[in-house]
Amino acid sequence: MYLVNPISGTGKKELLVNNIKKQTAARDIAYEVAYTTASGNYTLHKEKIVEEHFTDVVIIGGDGTVNQVVNNFRDIPYLQFGIIPLGSGNGLAYAAGIPKKPLQALHLIFDGTAKYTDAFTINNYFSCMLSGIGFDAKVAHDFAASASRGLFTYTQQSLINFFKAQPYQFEVIIDGFSFFTDAYFISIANSNQFGNNVTIAPQASLNDGLLDIVVVQKMHKARLPFAVLQQIRGNNKLQQMVEDMSQKNILYFQTPCILIRNLKHAPFHIDGEPMETSGEFKVSIIKDCFKLIQP
């Protein structure tokens, strides 16, 4: 089953869907095209998948669509998921090595291998890629409210928010160890990137049973872009918990679970989708949560 988000990305979908139909028919594969729901209710889709024994669901959309579909269908044990990335960021797809070009991604779905992939819960929510608290979440909220989509609009909102950004107060608790921090943002990552191959958690793996946590701490704002660039380039190594966590501009560590107290109610996003924030976030990995078709 192909599940198409009709509003994801910036291009028209009709030509792409027609090409997908032709390519799939040429492989003599039975298929059906359906569309995602704005309400998030997939009961009818799920009943059809189970009753008619669909083996694969191919998501044509971005990270938010992937989150919604996987969360609804992940309890069907035999089901495999594919992604044709058509969103603004496509972080999970690119982290998994799925090609950017839609028809190349389709050929991977035909010929690739389904591999177990982790996800995580954050309070009562599901995340399969990356969630964040603070600056990046503010960008996600403003991007969602924008009239236009795409990388240009996302970059524009990032620049606007950079000049207004102020650090937020957090308490971070990991396995009995805790520390307070003033930070511009905290990223909780299963994939290695925000999207568009911007790698915020270079050591992240989709199936290692660990969350990668990146804490961008308070620093002079002129230093902030350079510090983040060092993180993106992989120059910041994973670290152990130490008594004084203020020694580094950016903290980077791994853990299967974490508790974050959001003392100033910084904004929050899940897989790039703006969410209502909370004063506390309990985060836990879900090992081998679903099967994703990859190279």
Where are these regions (language model features)?
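ATP/NTP phosphate-donor binding region
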Residues: 1-57, 71, 178
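Catalytic core of DAGKc-family lipid kinases
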Residues: 27, 34, 75-188
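Short Gly/Thr/Asp-enriched flexible loops that form oxyanion-binding sites at enzyme active sites
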Residues: 64-77
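Short gly/pro/ser/thr-enriched loop/turn and capping motifs at secondary-structure boundaries
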Residues: 66, 88-92, 222
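ATP/nucleoside-binding phosphotransfer catalytic cores, i.e., glycine-rich phosphate-binding loops
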Residues: 174, 205, 217-295
